């Protein structure tokens, strides 16, 4: 039995072809932070006949089962990424829409200190930073615009 079959069963979901195909697409590195519509188009490009309503339904089921995490970035539409064991935060460029994942121990520690100051035990958190490209919006045409500086 494939790993994806087992992952669906472990999440309490029946193994179906649409669920398997959607999970396969979500596992592709270029499909992080993908909307339902983008995922649907990707499935069409791959020759899969899965309707948009099914894509929405499966993504909601995956979200409920903890297979994916739903994010609501600027712009109003939900995007999805596979749930991971490691925590990370997001930096979103308002010019091109690129979403950059990052982890920073100093930020994590500071959040814990703030919670402790107010006598709150953190159970979860998410941090979204929004900004505009430092290169006057030219990031839309430059695939390297958001590479980390050395």
Swiss-Prot record:
Chain spans, region DNA-binding: 1-84
Binding locations of Fe cation: 87, 89, 108, 125
Pfam family, one: FUR
PANTHER family: FERRIC UPTAKE REGULATION PROTEIN (PTHR33202:SF2), ZINC UPTAKE REGULATION PROTEIN (PTHR33202)
Function comment: Fur acts as a repressor, employing Fe(2+) as a cofactor to bind the operator of the iron transport operon.
Protein name per its UniProtKB record: Ferric uptake regulation protein
Family membership noted in the UniProt record: Belongs to the Fur family.
Gene that produces this protein: fur
Keywords carried by this UniProt record: Cytoplasm, DNA-binding, Iron, Metal-binding, Repressor, Transcription, Transcription regulation, Zinc
Gene Ontology CC annotations of this record: cytosol
Molecular function in Gene Ontology: DNA-binding transcription factor activity; transcription cis-regulatory region binding; zinc ion binding
Oligomer status and interactors: Homodimer.
Keyword rRNA-binding: no
UniProt: Zn(2+) binding residues: 33, 81, 90, 93, 96, 101
Subcellular location per the Swiss-Prot or TrEMBL entry: Cytoplasm
Region feature (Dimerization): 85-143
Domain of life: Bacteria
SUPFAM superfamilies: Winged helix' DNA-binding domain
GO biological process: negative regulation of DNA-templated transcription; negative regulation of siderophore biosynthetic process
Broad class of the protein's primary localization: cytoplasm
């Amino acid at each position: 039995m494939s790993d994806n079959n087992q992952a669906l069963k472990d999440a309490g979901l029946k193994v179906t072809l649409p669920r398997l195909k959607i999970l396969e697409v979500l596992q592709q590195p270029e499909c992080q932070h993908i909307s339902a519509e983008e995922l649907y188009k990707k499935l069409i490009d791959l020759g899969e006949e899965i309707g948009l309503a099914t894509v929405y339904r499966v993504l909601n089921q995956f979200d409920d089962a903890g297979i994916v995490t739903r994010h609501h970035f600027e712009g109003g539409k939900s995007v999805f990424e596979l749930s991971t064991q490691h925590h990370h935060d997001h930096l979103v460029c308002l010019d091109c829409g690129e979403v950059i994942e990052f982890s920073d121990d100093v930020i994590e520690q500071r959040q814990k200190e703030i919670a402790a100051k107010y006598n709150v035990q953190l159970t979860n958190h998410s941090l979204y930073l929004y900004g505009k490209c430092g290169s006057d919006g030219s990031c839309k045409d430059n695939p390297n615009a958001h590479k980390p500086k050395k």
